[in-house]
């Protein structure tokens, strides 16, 4: 199977270990088309997006999973978001030249947060320090502290593709260290070139052909920002009429840019009048953009 932009889930039936492989192609390039990122920033954002798709597939929820880093170094912010529909979006902010190296060199001192926003429920967030050689190690630290399940990730990205491989023991498998070490050792033989060049099924066969692996149907992944004029209107309405009138008086127009996809929205006085006329008919509800 040569299709890209797919998430593949698989299970080691005799070892009770689950795995996932995601390959992002057109969806990743759609993210890059919105911003001009330096090569190192590209790589980190691509790895974060691959990881977010992988992690979102480990839980049952309706909503979004957000991976975010905040740091004091050159790469100041990464935001990668995936939904239960397997859509993604992401952005990065940086300052000056971003060195290629360990997390401390690229990010400086910082933290990594994973937030699960579920429809109708309060968000859940877990935070760890940005520690380790790379983003995969930082996420492994998160899992070791939060879920206490053996977990390994391999993440790579270039200007064309972002790829991630995920392994995790099932709760009932805890204590079977020999199985885990064998599977993890097989996976650790994978190379960056293989991850970026081999079709998914070929890559999995190359790594695990001696194991009993059940491969589930692939799930398509796509880029979707999710911003819309309607959502922006709800955000503006939440500011209130007085605040909007103040901005319009000063600037003549309200301009809003989506940081994820760079789409531009304009709102003038006519738009404001229409917005608040409609709000009389339908009370404002808080919506996160």
From Swiss-Prot:
Its main location: cytoplasm. InterPro entries: Heat_shock_Hsp33, Heat_shock_Hsp33_C, Heat_shock_Hsp33_N, Hsp33_helix_hairpin_bin_dom_sf. GO terms for cellular component: cytoplasm. One of its GO terms (biological process) is protein refolding. Keywords: Chaperone, Cytoplasm, Disulfide bond, Redox-active center, Zinc. Under oxidizing conditions two disulfide bonds are formed involving the reactive cysteines. Under reducing conditions zinc is bound to the reactive cysteines and the protein is inactive. The keyword Zinc applies. SUPFAM superfamilies: Hsp33 domain, HSP33 redox switch-like. The keyword Zinc applies. Belongs to the HSP33 family. PANTHER family: 33 KDA CHAPERONIN (PTHR30111:SF1). Redox regulated molecular chaperone. Protects both thermally unfolding and oxidatively damaged proteins from irreversible aggregation. Plays an important role in the bacterial defense system toward oxidative stress. This is 33 kDa chaperonin. It comes from Nitrosococcus oceani (strain ATCC 19707 / BCRC 17464 / JCM 30415 / NCIMB 11848 / C-107). The gene is hslO.
């Amino acid at each position: 199977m040569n299709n890209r932009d797919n998430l593949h889930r698989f299970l080691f039936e005799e070892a009770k270990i689950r795995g996932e492989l995601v390959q992002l192609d057109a969806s990743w390039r759609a993210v890059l088309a919105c911003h001009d990122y330096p090569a190192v920033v590209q790589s980190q954002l691509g790895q974060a997006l691959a990881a977010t798709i992988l992690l979102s597939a480990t839980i049952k929820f309706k909503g979004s999973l957000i991976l975010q880093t905040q740091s004091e170094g050159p790469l100041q912010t990464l935001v990668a978001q995936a939904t239960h529909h397997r859509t993604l979006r992401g952005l990065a902010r940086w300052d000056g030249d971003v060195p290629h190296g360990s997390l401390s060199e690229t990010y400086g001192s910082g933290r990594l947060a994973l937030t699960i926003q579920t429809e109708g429920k309060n968000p859940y967030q877990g935070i760890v320090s940005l520690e380790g050689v790379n983003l995969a190690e930082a996420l492994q630290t998160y899992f070791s502290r939060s879920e206490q399940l053996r977990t390994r990730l391999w993440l790579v990205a270039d200007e064309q593709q972002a790829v991630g491989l995920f392994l995790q023991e099932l709760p009932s498998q805890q204590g079977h260290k020999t199985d885990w070490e064998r599977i993890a050792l097989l996976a650790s033989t994978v190379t960056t070139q293989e991850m970026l060049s081999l079709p998914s099924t070929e890559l999995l066969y190359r790594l695990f052909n001696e194991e009993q692996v059940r491969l589930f149907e692939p799930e398509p992944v796509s880029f979707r920002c999710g911003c819309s004029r309607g959502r922006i209107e709800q955000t503006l309405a939440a500011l209130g009429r007085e605040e909007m009138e103040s901005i319009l008086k000063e600037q003549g127009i309200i301009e809003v840019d989506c940081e994820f996809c760079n789409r531009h929205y304009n709102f003038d006085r006519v738009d404001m009048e229409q917005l608040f006329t409609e709000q009389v008919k339908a009370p404002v509800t808080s919506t996160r953009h």
